[in-house]
Amino acid sequence: MSKYKISVYAICKNESKNIIKWYNSMKEADEIIVLDTGSTDDSINILKKLPKIKLYEEKIIPWRFDTARNKSLSYVSQDTDICVCTDIDEVFEKGWRKDLEESWNSSITRAKYLYNWNFDKYGKPATTFYLDKIHNRNDYTWTHPVHEVLKCLKKENIILLPNVVLNHHQDQNKSRHTYLPLLELSVKEHPNDDRNVHYLGREYMYYEKWDDCIKTLHNHLKLPTATWKDERSASMRYMAFSYYKKGYIEEAIMWYQNAIKEAPYLREPYYDLGNIYYLEKDYINSEYYLKKALKVKEKSLSYINEEKAWNETIYDLLSISCFYNKKYKEAIKYIKKAIKINKANQRLLDNYTYMQKYNI
């Protein structure tokens, strides 16, 4: 018999492609709550046929993620010991319940677990960090209209579950069009919330609103609560990229250097600066900073990770930089490393063949 009653709760809209895979990983729970917020595909019919699913339907107007999360949480049985909030494009690895129950006790309010946010082209985790959406029944509420936060209403007692792994398989065809206005609303409601000011600046970058990105992230860096160096460094990198896209090369380089100073233990700012020098055909500085990036061996468990700093791309750029710097043996060494990661890339193979002619 199980020690605890565990309930999974989720919101759903047009997830027919993901429901079965999600359900099969969640059915270790005692109860599964789904709030459908207006599906027009076959989601509702699929959900109705699945045992354990308790389906509710309600449109949230105006749309806010925190309102939808809180509504779905309200349907979780009051005698639940542990609540698990997931999205329907996420899948737990088998055995998650056993690991959770073995670590949980009545004094715990929340658990963090490993989250593979995305995967590289070879199916390996690319961005991994700890997520914290497992919690007790009555001490939490959701806040913020997007990039919603699970807020504790009392003193927290958090445990770490490194053996519980949740994998995210994002549908790249799904629109993010609501994110920007919701982030603007979130920052309007909470102008001193450093986390969402950072997210808003990043979103402006995604939309190529370079001036808005720079202004917003300047504000992020000024906030007294913006103390997490990883995120501060990321804000500086996004500002640098925006300056670069505006044609202000010196400002871009300055902010990449600031990002390095802020978090010298991260690979990403070195890589980004090396990449800018590469694009500007300054191969001496490109080689220098890409080699500095490779000295950072440990990938941080935060969402800040950038795939290109850790896959074949960094070796590809470094091999070309070394080649133009007439360091042919090193160029071949690094192109081999790139090919080892991506054996199917014909351009890399062609570069290797070409570089060998100079390895005399």
Q: What are the roles of these predicted feature ranges?
A:
Residues 17-20, 41-49, 95:
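Acidic helix N-cap motif at the loop->helix transition within catalytic regions
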Residues 70-82:
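Active-site nucleotide-sugar/metal-binding loop of Leloir-type enzymes
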Residues 25, 35-46, 60-62, 87-91:
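A conserved acidic beta->alpha catalytic loop
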Residues 7-28:
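Short, well-formed alpha-helical segments that are part of the catalytic scaffolds
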Residues 66-73, 91-219:
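Catalytic-site signature of metal-activated, phosphate-bearing donor transferases
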